[in-house]
Amino acid sequence: MLHIGGKTFTSRLLLGTGKYPSFEVQKEAVNVSEAEILTFAVRRMNIFEASQPNFLEQLDLSKYTLLPNTAGASTADEAVRIARLAKASGLCDMIKVEVIGCSRSLLPDPVETLKASEMLLEEGFIVLPYTSDDVVLARKLEELGVHAIMPGASPIGSGQGLLNPLNLSFIIEQAKVPVIIDAGVGSPKDAAYAMELGADAVLLNTAVSGAKDPVKMAKAMKLAIESGRLGFEAGRIPLKNYGTASSPQEGMPAF
């Protein structure tokens, strides 16, 4: 089970809702993924305009927890304003804090992310900050009281996978709150690897929505995350420099 801010979830896959080729494909991908948490950019949603279609109208919202994000914010103040807008819509009190510090790499601004997280915690939000793989920053965010840490595997939408698994493993090892690998996952292999490291969950968007067959990829990611988690719980064998025979040596005939 995945526990975030007093809420409990069965699925360890969080799914983004942007850039799908159609509402129909999006809805089917969400269904087969069996994700329970769906994230979306508040700035791209007409949450107060009933005449404008959006993906929320396509879903049975009783089955999902919505995770608005502050994509588009470049300062803490902007992120807080976006979060307040999402909360005012009545959708959810959870917020993914996303404050971008570089428009080219889309890497997060560490200082503004810390500030935004602190401000939103004071306002009673369930705060999930998107951050880099900086181990010290992750610790400082946890010390603030965030409800989960979301380090990026690599730049958003890059599909480069886990560029620094060592740092991610350090973050996972030290954290007392859930660690959700977010950004840069490109394939089921990446998702499984993140879970094998001990991550509590993986958040995906482009890897599914940008695939040739988003629905099939959503299913593949679901299975990869489940198998990666099982592998982590089972415990892999230690790495060795030399081979070790798997067959017993006792009872072998002498020639």
From Swiss-Prot:
Enzyme Commission number(s) from the entry: 2.8.1.10
Record-level GO cellular component terms: cytoplasm
Enzyme class: transferase
Reaction it catalyzes: [ThiS sulfur-carrier protein]-C-terminal-Gly-aminoethanethioate + 2-iminoacetate + 1-deoxy-D-xylulose 5-phosphate = [ThiS sulfur-carrier protein]-C-terminal Gly-Gly + 2-[(2R,5Z)-2-carboxy-4-methylthiazol-5(2H)-ylidene]ethyl phosphate + 2 H2O + H(+)
Similarity comment: Belongs to the ThiG family.
Keyword Cytoplasm: yes
Subunit composition and interactions: Homotetramer. Forms heterodimers with either ThiH or ThiS.
Protein name: Thiazole synthase
Cited Pfam families: ThiG
Role according to the record: Catalyzes the rearrangement of 1-deoxy-D-xylulose 5-phosphate (DXP) to produce the thiazole phosphate moiety of thiamine. Sulfur is provided by the thiocarboxylate moiety of the carrier protein ThiS. In vitro, sulfur can be provided by H(2)S.
Binding-site positions, 1-deoxy-D-xylulose 5-phosphate: 157, 183-184, 205-206
Gene3D superfamilies linked: Aldolase class I
One term of GO molecular function: thiazole synthase activity
Species for this entry: Bacillus pumilus (strain SAFR-032)
Record pathway: Cofactor biosynthesis; thiamine diphosphate biosynthesis
